[in-house]
């Protein structure tokens, strides 16, 4: 073994750095998104439980969902994750479903 082989052995392999990069860019925003949705879900169901759902309640729920998804989308965009596009699309879908059904 010469010096180059030893240095190559001591350096981290590219798969490890790609794995860390993937975790930082994708998993962290998804974790934040999960926390946002978990907190929002419990708050929404506490608010609506025991009441009849009117269009105003659906509008409030849709607005809260939309804000949570937009916040998660911003977090994903800042983290340079490609999933922010999908989060934005899902936010629009959830908003339309909550308003029309």
From Swiss-Prot:
Transmembrane segments: 20-40, 59-79, 81-101
Principal place of residence: endoplasmic reticulum
Gene Ontology CC annotation, any one: endoplasmic reticulum
Swiss-Prot/TrEMBL keywords: Endoplasmic reticulum, Membrane, Transmembrane, Transmembrane helix
Keyword Membrane among record annotations: yes
Source taxon at top rank: Eukaryota
Record bears the keyword Membrane: yes
Protein's cellular compartments: Endoplasmic reticulum; Membrane
Protein topology in the membrane: Multi-pass membrane protein
Protein name as annotated: Uncharacterized protein YGL204C
Source species: Saccharomyces cerevisiae (strain ATCC 204508 / S288c) (Baker's yeast)
